[in-house]
Amino acid sequence: MLKNIINKKNLFINNQQNIFQIIKRNKMTDSTVDNKGYIVGIYENEEFTPLGQQLNEKTNGHLLKSIKLSDTKGKVGDNLVLYNVTPEVSRVAIVGLGKKENNNSTTYEKNENTRKAIGSGVKALKSKNATHLTIDSNIGDAKQTAEGAFLSNFKFDFKTGTSGKTANSTNESIQVQLSPSPSSEECFKEGKILAESQNFARVLMETPANLLTPTNFVQHVSSQMKELIDSGKVEMIVREEQWVKDQKMGMFWGVAKGSDEPLKFLELHYRGASADGKDSIVYVGKGITFDSGGISIKPSANMGLMKGDMGGAATAVSAMFGVASLGLKVNLITITPLCENMPSGKATKPGDILTAANGKTVEVDNTDAEGRLILGDALHYACSFKPTHIIDIATLTGAIDVALGQHYAGCFTTTDSLWDQLNECGNISGERLWRMPLIPEYRKQMETSKVADLINSAGRSGGACCAAGFLKEFITADQSWSHLDIAGVMSSSEDGPYIRKGMTGKPTRTLIEFAKKNQQ
């Protein structure tokens, strides 16, 4: 039974990229009037986008009359579905675009408004069984249009349908065209790949821990990237326990040994700029496939969410998928240490001392502060490539959620130029970052052990900052490095216009944008 569920899950992952198809105008297949839907925009001044204006004129003002009779005022997020607008158009979703001329809008606001408008329209039409959608290309940039459409169509569960068979998703195959066809069709394709990449991260993060062990994680990545690996575009290297011991990664092994599930150390290499792989960017993702807290066990309430504690690893490998699929001229390496954090007779205990790969000793005060342990060894290894930048991504601390909530990820770096780039990429993608302090005083809080060089937990005060200070101990001098604490943005507690309640897959698109910005 378990094997059948896993096989169905692999089939879902393979099909996830094919939810949408880009098709030319008037070339939709198997379409009927009953399954067609149109998405048009309206501004707060009651002005339609061109396709909406055409439909309004063709129906003697029916669209505008309907708007005036409704609560829809053209604000971003508003939507109204009309039926039987013309004999050829069975459904029209009118989506609010806000003010038409707003010179004060930032890049973030403009891009987000497009994603929100498209996402609300797709969800509204999909709920009415429309599967062949025509979107007015004048609503916004083609790239953000594709992102809003693909991301909003994502849904993942194991519920049984009327047939009694378990399904991983209720997603239907939806065909999308833009009207009029944009000159920048490549932008739409790029947005599609960006959204598919994030959706893959969401699949990994949503999958329950019994179906996503470290071994399963590697299998899913191998399946997702099969074409890229087979074609030689991506090299996949899977390290086992003995290699970790040979590398003297005592912190990683100290966490992994508490579980019966074997650890994995996954490396992916993409050489899009040069065959020698020089001047690479390295993404390091925390890969705790389930975090019970270990001997310092977590409270039972909401522990199930800790299936997503490998969100850093999920977004790192998903970014690799996007970068390689886009064929960006950049060299990229992803490193993901994968294991579970479990209590057992073999598990590390509070008070134990571990020796890191760089030779430093660490007193384990709290086994639930395990992410920084596996990341420390992985970061030391990442430095051996002498990359241009190292970015680690981790659901590291509850403290960052308390500080920033679900709307910003915390960014720690001492390199101003790196922060500027990441901040710009976050504004483009809509996955916002907030710079947090990384000063020596926080590191000193991690040096309070009487028996070791470092302690892995310094208490409540400045928790996220102290964790970042701990990680910095494993970065070589003068190495450009940033730590992204994504614990707050790991999941969304409510449905949004284009991101549903659940695991978000953030900041996958930001990582892809960063690689794009650093092409050689």
UniProtKB/Swiss-Prot annotation:
Its cofactor is Zn(2+). It is an enzyme of class 3 (hydrolase). It catalyses: Release of an N-terminal amino acid, Xaa-|-Yaa-, in which Xaa is preferably Leu, but may be other amino acids including Pro although not Arg or Lys, and Yaa may be Pro. Amino acid amides and methyl esters are also readily hydrolyzed, but rates on arylamides are exceedingly low; Release of N-terminal proline from a peptide. Keywords: Aminopeptidase, Cytoplasm, Hydrolase, Metal-binding, Protease, Zinc. Zn(2+) 2 binds at K286, D291, D309, E370. It is found in: Cytoplasm. The keyword 4Fe-4S does not apply. SUPFAM superfamilies: Macro domain-like, Zn-dependent exopeptidases. One of its GO terms (molecular function) is peptidase activity. One of its GO terms (biological process) is proteolysis. One of its GO terms (cellular component) is cytoplasm. Zn(2+) 1 binds at D291, D368, E370. Belongs to the peptidase M17 family. Homohexamer. HAMAP family: Cytosol_peptidase_M17. This is Cytosol aminopeptidase. It comes from Dictyostelium discoideum (Social amoeba). The gene is lap.
